[in-house]
Regions:
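Intrinsically disordered terminal and processing segments
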Residues: 1-63, 67-128
Length: 128
């Protein structure tokens, strides 16, 4: 019985250490993502067409196709979005189109995915 208790205590300790390690890594990823900056989109410089862009910040990977018509962003299609729990961030494309800017707020609870989507759009339009 004593051996069983020792094993249980060791397992609990390992689970706690694993959880704390995961939390530290997740916090580091979020803090790294929050310091990224975005270029301002000059709609006067946008040429009509469809542009592909990609961005990856662990654990999120995004590919987009951005459509420009009459110098305005008219559509952003998410071709790929490996997101973990960041699916709610996909609505950020509507904000980008509405404001014609990457200077839009991240979706709460999906910060890393929001930033990755904005960076992929930036890549599609500016090649960054």
């Amino acid at each position: 019985m004593k051996t069983l208790k020792k094993i249980a205590v060791i397992l609990i300790i390992l689970v706690v250490i694993g959880f704390l390690g995961f939390k530290l890594v997740a916090n580091k990823i979020i803090s790294d993502a929050k310091v990224l900056t975005f270029e301002e989109i000059d709609s006067g410089q946008l040429k009509d067409g469809e542009y592909l862009g990609n961005y990856e910040i662990f654990p999120v990977k995004v590919s987009v196709k951005t459509t420009v018509l009459n110098g305005k962003i008219t559509q952003i299609e998410l071709l790929e979005h490996f997101n973990g729990k960041g699916a709610p961030a996909e609505k950020i494309v509507d904000d980008i189109i509405e404001k014609q800017s990457l200077q839009v707020d991240a979706v709460s609870g999906a910060t890393v995915s929001s930033i990755a989507i904005k960076k992929a759009v930036e890549d599609s339009l500016l090649g960054k």
